[in-house]
Regions:
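N-terminal Rossmann-like NAD(P)+-binding domain of SDR-like oxidoreductases, especially those catalyzing
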Residues: 1-134
Length: 134
């Protein structure tokens, strides 16, 4: 059986990827830090019991080593969505976390076949906004 890792798998987009991978017959492992700003009540009810769940930080190399064990495909959705005024936190979580993912695969010579890095809900923002020109 093929195993997919979905980082940020407890989040909005990641949870849909988890559902789709399970429906397609994949084994799924979720890596999510359950950041309090997003998950005030802890692990959400929509996280499926048949998916393995690791609570961890993408900025930790040991977390990556554990999460990537036996993985064929990574869907990398973990991201810190806020950026102002915490630009350093944004770069640390999103940039360094992704770099550690790729370094861990390379350094451990892991047989990961694909890494899918997609955008997040940040591209369409939150709430209703009006454009003065349209």
């Amino acid at each position: 059986m093929k195993t997919a890792l979905v980082t940020g798998g407890a989040g909005l987009i990641g949870s849909h990827i988890v559902d789709g991978a399970l429906a397609a017959g994949w084994d799924v492992r979720i890596l999510d830090n359950l950041q309090r700003q997003t998950h005030r009540e802890g692990k959400p009810d929509w996280v499926p019991g048949e998916a393995e769940f690791i609570q961890g930080d993408v900025r930790n190399r040991r977390t990556w080593e554990r999460a990537l064990d036996g993985i064929a495909v990574v869907f990398h959705q973990a991201a810190y969505g806020g950026y102002m005024p915490e630009i350093a936190k944004f770069i640390d979580s999103n940039g360094v976390g992704t770099a550690l993912l790729l370094e861990t695969i390379r350094d451990k010579n892991l047989p990961v076949r694909k890494v899918v890095v997609a955008s997040s809900q940040a591209v369409y923002n939150e709430g209703a906004y009006r454009c003065p020109e349209h």
